[in-house]
Amino acid sequence: MGKALSHVAKHTCHDECQDSLTSSPGYSAMQTDDSKSGGDVSQFPYVEFTGRDSVTCPTCQGTGRIPRGQENQLVALIPYSDQRLRPRRTKLYVMASVILCLLLCTLAVFFLFPRSIDVNYVGVKSVYVSYDQSKRIVYLNVTNSLNITNNNYYSVDVANITARVQFSQTVIGKTRISNITTIGPLDMKQIDYMVPTTIADEMSYMYDYCTLQSIKVHNIVVMMQITVTTVYFGHAEQVSQEMYQYVDCGGNTTALHEYSLNTPLTG
């Protein structure tokens, strides 16, 4: 008897709830909308947009299209784990890029900054002497040595060496050597060059001195002038030196003469 009453009560409540729902204004509005649309879901068919009237859907992984002009009206739903919701750390990347650029610029300036190229005159390496007795001329082939040091972190080319020998305010010999050698980074090379000289004309009196048999050493003082031209990265640099040197005009000499009166640096 109790079960029957419970069932009847539940059925009665169901009918009353349904009547209350159907009589509500919201339900009537929904029924009105359905009646206008015919109650058929075919009013919302699947439409594929192609061509210029559509754009790529940003949340469809490039496989869908949406009508053009509705980009600001449609709302895209993406998963919470999507990469686009994560912070891009733009400031961190920009700061790291700036620090890396500054480091590279500092290294480039350090290694490419031009440093000095040192030229050290070693001395006279050898002297070959010959005479012209009839014309009272003294010929001297003077071979000199230079130490050229490259203090840069890149190679430099020794383009040419210009040398002059001067005796008693008169230039008695000069030479020019081109395309000599290449010096590596932080390296040093010794270069030998020969200057042919002639003592004649108003200095013919030196013939008697150089051929005098009563003395063994016939030293004369000459001024050596050298200009070394180096090239790196298309830039030419010149280093000049002047020094006074003893030269024996009385006979051939093969020993290195390291002594000089002074070695002032002029370039």
Swiss-Prot record:
Keyword Ligase: no
Annotated signal sequence range: none
Membrane topology of this protein: Single-pass type II membrane protein
Swiss-Prot/TrEMBL keywords: Cell membrane, Disulfide bond, Endosome, Glycoprotein, Lysosome, Membrane, Signal-anchor, Transmembrane, Transmembrane helix, Transport
Lumenal membrane side: 114-267
InterPro entries: TMEM106, TMEM106_C, TMEM106_N
Protein name, per record: Transmembrane protein 106B
Organism: Danio rerio
